[in-house]
């Protein structure tokens, strides 16, 4: 049985030649130039652009938070709008050149807000979370580049199954805690809670390998150039997830 990446932006179907052909047929007006192909360097450049946009937006809400400005509206609004843009892009990848920068902008507002909240509670936590995320990314990239870790179908199956299990658990826990006094086991700083955070971080990191693999396949299959934005957006989504999980883990360890 074949599994695709949990990230809707980085699924085999999205990067397949057949899917691209269908997109070309739909967009006969040539709004997107399908004659240009996705390249690795182009995807790297797009990822860097999105990262800079995200960091720039994050600095705005960070500055607001530490200067007495209420950040709830831009932070929550950014998260909601960012999610909406993710959903739209998942169904319309050809619009990624426009939606991806918007996602980075609004998600950055959310990241800046939540980072400021954690920093106020645990001074120094943000720089540690950023460092941990960067190191994890570089290690995973190195392991993938030198073929130390190979993305096989079994590897995909395990990572995707674990990711879906985490997403399901988070969703159920959130819904139940909203309507009952139940406290999910991943809350607090118990050993069980810390163990869950470590497990989630490992799975998030393993998703990076799926991201790298799908981007590489997109380049090999010579899909249209707009897929550079699509792939870059998917990679940023995984990095944001990883960063948030590091914030959670470090906050739990700080309480010990």
Q: Model features per residue range: what roles?
A:
Residues 1-256:
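A hydrophobic alpha-helical transmembrane-helix feature that marks the membrane cores
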